[in-house]
Structures are given as C-alpha cells and as structure tokens.
Amino acid sequence: MSTRLSKLFVRTLREDPVDAEVASHRLLVRAGYIRRQAPGIFAWLPLGLRVKNKVEAIVREEMERIGAQEVHFPALLPAEPYQATGRYDEYGPGMFRLEDRKRAPMVLAPTHEEFFALLVKDLYSSYKDLPLSIYQIQDKYRDEARPRAGILRGREFTMKDAYSFDHTDAGLAVSYQAQRDAYERIFQRLGLEYVIVAADAGAMGGSKSEEFLHPTPIGEDTFVRSPGGYAANVEAFTTLVPESIPIEGQSAARVFDSPDTPTIATLVDLANAREPREDGRAWTAADTLKNIVLALTHLDGTRELVVVGIPGDRDIDLKRAEVAFFPAEVEPATEGDLAKQPGLVKGYIGPWSPEGPVLGSTSSTKVRYVVDPRVVDGSSWITGANVAGKHVLSLVAGRDFTPDGVVEAADVRDGDPAPDGSGPITAGRGTEIGHVFELGRKYAEALGLKVLDENGKLVTVTMGSYGIGITRNLALVAEATQDGRGLLWPASISPFDVHVVMTGKGDEIASASEELVDALDAAGLDVLFDDRPKVSPGVKFGDAELIGVPTIVIVGRGAVDGMAELWDRRTNERTPVALADVVGALTADR
C-alpha cells in the first residue's frame, strides 16, 4: 500500500515545541506524529497512529500466543467497585472523578482490575472454566500533578492490561510466568533494552511484583543491580541487616555538651575532639543516629508525626518513605507540626533524654518512632538528647530505646550490599515499560469472586495483573533510536517500510517514481511517496530524516539512466542501485 505525502495529513515543523523536555517529545511533534491539546493530553495524527497500531499489533500477537483473549471496557465507569476495594481513596487526587446527572459518582478509569474481576464473577462459577487470561488495549486516565516529557508521562495514555484467573496459587504462578515471558518477547521485538527488577506493589497490592525498566538517562525511576544478578527498583530494595550485638558490657549512655553542631559533620568533629572513642577509631557519620520528623496525611485526612531514625551518613529517600508508609501521603514536618510537639527539641531530637524515653508509642510524646534496619539491638549511637545543646553517647538500641518498628526509608547507594549476598549494587536510571503482579486474592475477596473447586467447595479465585504502556513504549523507542537529525524507527514499528523521495523535475523522473512505487506496493511493501511537486530536495531530505522511516529510496536525475539511490538511515550510507533492482534489494530478507 502506498501513501502520497502530498495527500497525507501532516505538517512538519522546523522549530522545537517550547515545552519539550526530551528528544522524543520534540521529534514526535516536529515530525507530525502528535499534537498537544492540553498539558499531558495529545492528539494522534496519521503517522503517529500507524506506529501506535504496530506496537499494539505486536502486543496482540504475543497475547494471543499465550492464549489470552481480548475484551474492551469503557473508560467511564461507576466508582462503586473502586470504593469496595479501597482504591477509590488510595488513588487520591490522581483519579479523575465526576458525577453523572443523577449524582452517581463516576471515574475515568486509571486501571480496570475491579471490572475484570466482576466480569468473570458474572460469567464463570466453576474451576473448570479456569485458567483464564483476558486483556484489553484501552486509554487510561490519571491526573498527573506534573505531566512531563510528552507522551512519556501524560494524563491520558494507552495501555495493555491483562488479567489472569486461577483457582490455585500454583495455577497463578504458571499464568504469571507465561505473561512475563510474553513481555520479554514484546520488548525484544520493539528493540527496547530492559531490566527486570523486583518492585513494590503500591496501590495494586498483591504478593509479588516485578517491573520491566528501560535503562535511559531520562528515566524517573532508580533501580539497582549486582554482579550476581540481583535487581530491584530502589523502592523495593531491602537493606542487608547486620547481626545484633551483645548488650552486656557496653558503656552506659552519657550526655555531653554539643553546642553549635547544626550538621552531622560538625557533630562528628566535636565528638572526635572532646569525646574520643575508647577503641582509638575516629567517630564517623555512620556512628550517629539522625532522627527525621515526617508528617503523614492518612486517607481519612488525619495528620500524624512520625520520627524515622537512620544512620547519620544516610539521607531520607522520600520515595522509599512513601512506600513504607503507604497509603499515607508523606512530607517533611513543618515548623507548625513541630510546634505542636514541644517535647521534640529541633536539632537535638532523639529517642531518649535524661528524663526517660521521648519517642515511641510508650514515651512521653507518644510520637511513633521507627528506625532503619541497620539499627539493630546492641548497636550504639551518638544522637540528640532532646535538650538544647546536648547529645548523648553510647545510646544502645534494645537497652536504652525500643523503636515501634523498622522501615526502609534511607537512601540506597552504589556499593551497598545486595540483600541476597550477590555483591555490591550499582544504581541506574530507567523508565517503567511493563509491570507484572501476582495480585493473589485481594480483589476477588473484596468483590466476592469465587468458583466451585474439584470438591464442590467455594474457593476464592486468585488473580494476576499485567500492564504494558503502549504509548510510553512508543515514546521510549523514539527516544532510544533517534539520531539528532530525526526519528529512526526500527522496522518492526516504522510507519512505512520504505520512503520514496522524488527529486528533480521532468516526466521521466515522475514516471520512474510512479512505476517504482507501484512495484514496491505490488511486492507487499508499505510505501510513503514524497511526490510534492513544489518542495525542494533539501526540504524533502530533511523531512525524510525527521519522519524516520529507516529505508529511503531517492529517485532523481539518475532515473533517466535507470538509476536510484538507497539511503540507509541507520548508517547514513547512500548506495547507487538500478531502478529495476530496488524491489529485489528491499525484499531479499523479508
């Protein structure tokens, strides 16, 4: 099939859009694939839809290969099922909410777990109907606070979401692995590099979660991996916990004067000058216990102060803290928050004071106190004494203070040991391109999805959820393959197989171009034909680079002698070829 550029609904641009932050956003707009309608909302033009449809076709082929069947749900749905599972509140302001004319609460769906479960509940009642895998490719809606990077993080986006239904955990494991394998094949066909990492389940819930991340400098996610094969999203990384230390024989806690120590560094310098260690080693930041006050806003609107104790050589990672305290919103405590707790002396906060415990559910303040996993029983710390100008030495966990719990909220750094013992980790940046979950029975229990098992007993169905961002993957392919001059699509999702550029004037050139396009069409190739009569060769070549079809055929003055040029955009090499040989050259490997 051939498409004439003179008739195609497209307008290429010479200037970058002013709001574009990344190359894929700039080039998809300039090449006429998408147009911005509002922040995070884009219209898809014919070129963009061609690529988007090809991405969807690859996903459909791989879903059908594992026996998943396609369905389609509305984007506009009643709120009640989301309320039943608790996600109506958990999503917070990220969910688009509205009411119909009868004042019934509705949503623009961010995801469809509840409705897939209800559909299966409505139609199936026996284990003999299972296992079942169904999926859809549908637009989703999330009210992003800061839409960015074009279609990489928008408020409307297209996803493939699949769901598996089994009546046993063993069956779920099989379904999960089938989807996971299908995802690997999809990303390989798209030509996207990926890393599979352990991930936090977040609002989705469930017992197991893995992300497929595409390593990229523009990624908004941090992941870590070790030489021995460990890989995790930084939010799911677990600290290697040291052994507890015997408490007996350790020095008693002792308060010392520490004026003018606003930072951990100044505190360490003072301790080394005035309170040298008995073993002769110098104090370091890792010997101090930093106590960070966070404010949690719970789903019911209540606000709670929590103090997190971490080694002083670490900082709080708010993303990890959000996971630790989910579904509450997390932010640093304000001056107003601290004013309501006069028992906490800013700059000198600690779990203990000479008058007794200051932090924890049984303390004088009743402020919840949680600590980093490295704060094990018997570990000894320098920390605030809750008295202005004073710190305490040799404060021992399990003897002098007992935290309310342990949280993973400290930052993760290169060189930290992997929790499975597979070596030191290194961190990288990436963007999520797929996510697979073993949901278990969370949604089925909330919605009453049960079937009769082999013994005639009602059992709750166990589910899996599997998502791929169609539009995000398209943008990341564009980002990864562009060469600065324009887009450069892999053949698997290029909008056309070949781009024929007619240059020069005269009936012979026009006739040769038309005949070549017809021959390529007859050979089964999808052809974009730049037949624009009043456009210079330079502009045509610039547009060809911008649009990004990887194979270009130039038909110019050489056509009089039966010659054309093959232009390989990947290598930027141009090769003379006889017009009669073009079709054979382009179909040899098909």
UniProtKB/Swiss-Prot annotation:
Subunit (UniProt):
Homodimer.
User: What name has this protein been given in UniProt?
Assistant: Proline--tRNA ligase
Question: What Pfam families does this protein's entry cite?
Answer: HGTP_anticodon, tRNA-synt_2b, tRNA_edit
Q: Which family does it belong to?
A: Belongs to the class-II aminoacyl-tRNA synthetase family. ProS type 1 subfamily.
Recorded coiled-coil stretches: none
| Subcellular locations according to the entry | Cytoplasm
Q: Give the GO molecular function terms.
A: aminoacyl-tRNA deacylase activity; ATP binding; proline-tRNA ligase activity
Q: What is its EC number?
A: 6.1.1.15
A GO CC term attached to the entry: cytosol
Keyword annotations for this protein? Aminoacyl-tRNA synthetase, ATP-binding, Cytoplasm, Ligase, Nucleotide-binding, Protein biosynthesis
HAMAP family in the record? Pro_tRNA_synth_type1
Q: Which Gene3D superfamilies match?
A: Anticodon-binding domain, Bira Bifunctional Protein, Domain 2, YbaK/aminoacyl-tRNA synthetase-associated domain
Reaction equation(s) it catalyzes: tRNA(Pro) + L-proline + ATP = L-prolyl-tRNA(Pro) + AMP + diphosphate
Q: What does this chain do? A: Catalyzes the attachment of proline to tRNA(Pro) in a two-step reaction: proline is first activated by ATP to form Pro-AMP and then transferred to the acceptor end of tRNA(Pro). As ProRS can inadvertently accommodate and process non-cognate amino acids such as alanine and cysteine, to avoid such errors it has two additional distinct editing activities against alanine. One activity is designated as 'pretransfer' editing and involves the tRNA(Pro)-independent hydrolysis of activated Ala-AMP.
An example of a Gene Ontology BP annotation on this entry?
prolyl-tRNA aminoacylation
Domain notes from UniProt? Consists of three domains: the N-terminal catalytic domain, the editing domain and the C-terminal anticodon-binding domain.
Annotated region (Disordered), positions in chain? 409-428
